[in-house]
Every structure is written in C-alpha cells, then in structure tokens.
Amino acid sequence: RPPRPPPRGTPPRRHSFRKHLYLLRGLPGSGKTTLARQLQHDFPRALIFSTDDFFFREDGAYEFNPDFLEEAHEWNQKRARKAMRNGISPIIIDNTNLHAWEMKPYAVMALENNYEVIFREPDTRWKFNVQELARRNIHGVSREKIHRMKERLESDLM
C-alpha cells in the first residue's frame, strides 16, 4: 500500500541539511581566499578546495597554465566529491565561478550528497575596482585580464 498523505493543514516537511557547501565567487583579488580562510576559522573542520591548488608546484610557486585548466577543474571537482562522500562539512569551493555553469557540477554533487549549497561573495569595497583587484590578487592576474573577466561576470546569479 502507498503511504498515506499527511492530514490537511499539516505544514510541508522541510528538509534539514546538516552538511554545507560554500560556493565562493568573485574576481581575482576580491577577497575570496580571505573569506574562505575566515570560514575555515569559524568552522575548523572545514576543507577548502580551489582549482588554483592544481597549479602550485612542489616548491610552493604558482605556475598557471591555461592548457591544463579543464583538467584542473576536473581534479578539484573530484576532490570535492570525495570529501562529500566522506561527509566532511562544511566544504568551501574557492574559485572565481564567474558563470553558473562553473558552479553547477559542485551544486549537483552537493544535492546528490544531501548538502545545502550556500553562495557567498566577498563584501569588499574593491570587489569591482579593476585597478585595486590587479594590485591585490596573489596570482599576478593583469588589469586587462581582470577587466575582461569583470565584463563576463554573470551578476544575477545570487
């Protein structure tokens, strides 16, 4: 027999998530990594996953190569998926995430693993100031590149 429906007037059952995925987004230099570290300070069990990690050499130097960007994103998604399967919470994704399609794989795997997805952007005064972003970003992304990224940033996602 199928289960009986709840009596009339019964409030809908809300899903209570016990695990959280923070999807950070913002231009280079906007404060994403600082926000990720603050979240990790607030939640000491948190793990931070960034596609940028793929480009750090063993000696700690950052060496970005756009030819490997797709592989780097797949690598980061695989790490996040493994952490979700292990029930780690919260998980923090520290990527630029300029477009919805960049966040979708993380959101899908989060829902498949019963995680609440929380979207966050740094709330810094300079988050759209191209000159300041170029000065502050830790990977040497040029002002021109940040300007192009800013033009492509989907602003109505949150």
Residue ranges, per PLM feature:
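Hydrophobic anchor at the beta1->P-loop junction of P-loop NTPases
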Residues: 24
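Glycine-rich phosphate-binding loop used to anchor ATP phosphates in small-molecule kinases
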Residues: 67-118
